[in-house]
């Protein structure tokens, strides 16, 4: 069902300054290029300012400086992107689950399910699990023994929680995610791998989001821990005993090896990899495809790898990289020879 909200109501909801017709009805959100007369748009990135001229949106979320030059209706806010984020939930068409248990769900006799929770078709909830009020568990979810899901949690269809996974309040988990799978732990005995039982669990804080097909392994001894407000994209691998600090965000395909600790307010771009048993301090930004091989103790942005080039140029660069050892050796020899004939023996490049 499409929501219809008056522009004045949206201004009140945001605490925004209304410039225009407060009675105008808004039925959805769209980009500056695509928005129609009943839709709200926003300008967050200056590179899209050029689209304001021909924008057909019913209204636009704008900063004060941009609103001065805009002839159409606007909601003036300090941060248009944040305002868009808040309003987006008012127009979200995602169906709302009704409280209750579907007849096909299988629930252990000693599991505790709050009457205000929604349990979907063919869900399985094992012994000792506790499901709080307002939780939605989608079709075909598996909730293992002694798991706990806090108030307001939302599990899409086909989420798997192995035993002893504890989840905080308002956590969102997308389809295919697996929490509490066995960590990759083996001891080598004369070339033969002997399995190590993974007897820890997984602890997830409040307001966490976990993307499609992301895996968070259980701890070998203590729990794997994900802090409050952490946001995890799709297809992320978090190994056993990893600790992730509050409000850290990770894009798709990040891989974190066992026992690594990541601080608060970090950002890991797509494809980042981290070796095990290292510490990353707070407020670190790792750019895409960065390979982290040692601890980071200073906040800031870090990168590794090579950026894209035209293929022919990249091949030349790769060939030069293979020659670096030889070039360094020849440079040392040249410096030595220059030093032998330079008064005072100074052959450094800065004189």
From Swiss-Prot:
- Any one GO CC term of the record: membrane
Keywords per UniProt: Acyltransferase, Lipid A biosynthesis, Lipid biosynthesis, Lipid metabolism, Repeat, Transferase
Annotated InterPro entries: Hexapep, Hexapep_transf_CS, LpxD, Trimer_LpxA-like_sf, UDP_GlcNAc_AcTrfase_non-rep
Active-site residues, record numbering mapped to chain: 240 (proton acceptor)
Q: Name one Pfam family in it.
A: LpxD
| Annotated GO biological process | lipid A biosynthetic process
Q: Which GO terms describe its molecular function?
A: N-acyltransferase activity
Name its pathway.
Answer: Bacterial outer membrane biogenesis; LPS lipid A biosynthesis
Q: Which reaction does it catalyse?
A: a UDP-3-O-[(3R)-3-hydroxyacyl]-alpha-D-glucosamine + a (3R)-hydroxyacyl-[ACP] = a UDP-2-N,3-O-bis[(3R)-3-hydroxyacyl]-alpha-D-glucosamine + holo-[ACP] + H(+)
Which top EC class is given?
transferase
Enzyme Commission number, as recorded? 2.3.1.191
NCBIfam families linked to this entry:
lipid_A_lpxD, PRK00892.1
Q: Which family does it belong to?
A: Belongs to the transferase hexapeptide repeat family. LpxD subfamily.
Alphabetical list of HAMAP family matching this protein: LpxD (MF_00523)
Self-association state and partner proteins as the record states: Homotrimer.
Function description: Catalyzes the N-acylation of UDP-3-O-acylglucosamine using 3-hydroxyacyl-ACP as the acyl donor. Is involved in the biosynthesis of lipid A, a phosphorylated glycolipid that anchors the lipopolysaccharide to the outer membrane of the cell.
- UniProt name for this protein: UDP-3-O-acylglucosamine N-acyltransferase
């Amino acid at each position: 069902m499409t929501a219809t909200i008056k522009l004045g109501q949206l201004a009140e909801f945001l605490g925004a300054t209304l410039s225009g017709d407060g009675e105008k009805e808004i039925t959805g959100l769209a980009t500056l290029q695509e928005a129609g007369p009943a839709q709200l748009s926003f300008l967050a990135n200056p590179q899209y300012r050029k689209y304001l001229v021909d924008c057909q949106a019913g209204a636009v979320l704008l900063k004060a400086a941009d609103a001065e030059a805009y002839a159409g209706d606007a909601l003036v806010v300090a941060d248009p992107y944040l305002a868009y984020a808040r309003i987006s939930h008012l127009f979200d068409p995602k169906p709302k689950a009704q409280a209750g248990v579907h007849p096909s769900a299988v629930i252990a006799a000693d599991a505790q399910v709050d009457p205000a929770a929604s349990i979907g078709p063919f869900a399985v909830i094992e012994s000792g699990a506790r499901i709080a009020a307002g939780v939605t568990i989608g079709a075909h979810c598996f909730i293992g023994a002694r798991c706990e899901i806090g108030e307001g949690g939302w599990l899409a269809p086909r989420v798997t929680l192995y035993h002893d996974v504890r989840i905080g309040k308002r956590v969102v988990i997308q389809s295919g995610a697996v929490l509490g799978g066995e960590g990759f732990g083996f001891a080598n005995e004369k070339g033969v791998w002997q399995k190590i039982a993974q007897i820890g669990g997984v602890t997830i804080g409040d307001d966490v989001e976990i993307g499609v097909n992301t895996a968070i392994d259980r701890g070998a001894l203590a729990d794997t821990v994900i802090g409050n407000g952490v946001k995890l994209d799709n297809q992320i691998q978090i190994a056993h005993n990893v600790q992730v600090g509050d409000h850290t965000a990770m894009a798709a395909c990040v891989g974190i090896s066992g026992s690594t600790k990541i601080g608060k307010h970090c950002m890991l771009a797509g494809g980042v990899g981290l070796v095990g048993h290292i510490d990353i301090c707070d407020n670190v930004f790792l750019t895409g495809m960065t390979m982290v091989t040692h601890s980071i103790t200073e906040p800031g942005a870090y990168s590794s790898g090579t950026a894209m080039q035209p293929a022919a140029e990249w091949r030349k660069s790769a060939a030069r990289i293979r020659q670096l050892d030889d070039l360094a050796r020849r440079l040392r020899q040249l410096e030595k020879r220059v030093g032998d004939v330079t008064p005072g023996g100074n052959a450094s490049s800065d004189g």
